[in-house]
Amino acid sequence: MRSLAALVLLFCDALEPPPTLPDGAEEATRAIATFRKDPRLTVELFAAEPRLGNPVAIGLDERNRVFVAEEYRFNRGTEENRTRPFFLEDDLRIRTLEDRLAMYRKFADRFEGGMDWFSRWTDQVRLLEDRDGGGRAEVASVFADGFHQPLDGLAAGILVREGDVYLTCIPNLWLLRDRDGDGKADFRESLHRGFGVNAGFLGHD
């Protein structure tokens, strides 16, 4: 048990946190001013860095809270045969997720830190809340993270329905729930596993 605890601690220490991003509100406001839109529409800034980063997909719940899939693993732990051509022949033979993991192990010495490269960064789900009704998110928190196993791809899709948050991050379709209402997912279940068998997948998951 002691050695297992030490292994977990070592694994956690190797995980790099998402970068701290500079305030992006001013830049976003300037960008909004250049939008071409129907004059009947209004575009206003709801959230910008550092309250969120690298947003890929969003979903709203019944309380108008915004859940954001944030992507930090692009080309950092998620590999493909277009940028890693030495994968190509092995990748064409892959039939299972276990085959892809074996391929990563075979070529691990080509990556900084070996197999640690594939689990050093994590994608996450951010929760944005406008609690005062002012039209901007003044509260931001991490709803769920830990999507950084070697086979994990990118947190690329999110759907929120009746308190359930569905997240696509290959090889899994995840169900996330906040059962105690503290704004963090305390329940996580893989509803289906098996997506993204091959490495040539970036941009298609």
Please place each PLM-identified region on the residue numbering.
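Sec-dependent signal peptide recognition
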Residues: 1-8
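Beta-propeller domains with acidic blade repeats across secreted/periplasmic ectodomains
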Residues: 2, 13-205
